[in-house]
Regions:
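Predominantly a Rossmann-like dinucleotide-binding segment in NAD(P)-dependent oxidoreductases
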Residues: 1-89, 143
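Beta-strand scaffold of nucleotide-dependent catalytic cores
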Residues: 9-12, 69, 108-111, 135-136
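Alpha-helix N-cap/helix-start motif
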Residues: 23-24, 46, 117-119, 136
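Glycine/small-residue-rich pyrophosphate-binding loop that anchors the diphosphate of NDP-sugar donors
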Residues: 45, 49, 95-97, 105
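Glycine-rich phosphate/pyrophosphate-binding beta-alpha loops
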Residues: 51, 110-119
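C-terminal glycine/acidic-rich active-site capping loop/insertion
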Residues: 59, 76-96, 100-103, 124-125, ...
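Short, well-ordered turn and helix-capping elements at secondary-structure junctions
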Residues: 71, 111-113, 130
Length: 166
């Protein structure tokens, strides 16, 4: 991105999906479930998961200047582990938002703990005039890079790049 290989950036997409709170019988509160308590966690998926997507996006693509978001709490009440009584859930279970970066590119961000089958799916993709870049947490050391080679159309295409500390 810093080298300009993607050209002018048009789109940024990121998601962070999990399924560990989809069970409606899952209680809230206590040491193991502090993320479900707004008094302790501060927020739900927006602060816990989506914050990583936002931080990475700003690092790669610059500041965000506009946002329009929606959140949802799918299970409105859960039994508290300490009291055994039902209490209102005060965190967000899912968040989706559109954003605009200072460079003019548009973004879509999504995070949820209600994506059955996903334990920690975190992906991002950046699309530019000259190429695209995709990354998946499940394959941490690999970038997928599409090079739109203007000089030689025969070399256009996706490439898998192994990345490491070196």
């Amino acid at each position: 991105v810093d080298e300009g290989r993607l050209g002018k950036i048009y789109h940024y997409r990121a998601n962070f999906l999990q399924d560990w709170t989809i069970n409606t019988d899952l209680p809230q509160g206590g040491e193991g479930l502090w993320r479900l308590d707004a008094k302790v966690a501060g927020s739900g998926v927006t602060g816990d998961l989506l914050a990583h997507c936002i931080d990475t996006a700003i690092w790669l693509n610059g500041p965000i200047v506009e946002v329009s978001a929606m959140t949802e709490t799918f299970v409105k009440e859960r039994v508290h582990t300490k009291t055994g009584k039902k209490q209102k859930v005060t965190i967000d279970d899912a968040c989706a938002f559109l954003a605009k970066f200072a460079n003019g590119s548009l973004a879509i961000f999504e995070s949820t703990r209600y994506a059955r089958g996903h334990k920690a799916l975190y992906t991002l993709e950046i699309n530019g005039a000259d190429g695209s870049l995709a990354w998946d947490l499940h394959d941490l050391h690999r970038l997928e890079y599409y090079d739109y080679d203007k000089e030689d159309p025969k070399t256009r295409g996706w490439r898998s790049i192994h990345v490491s500390d070196n």
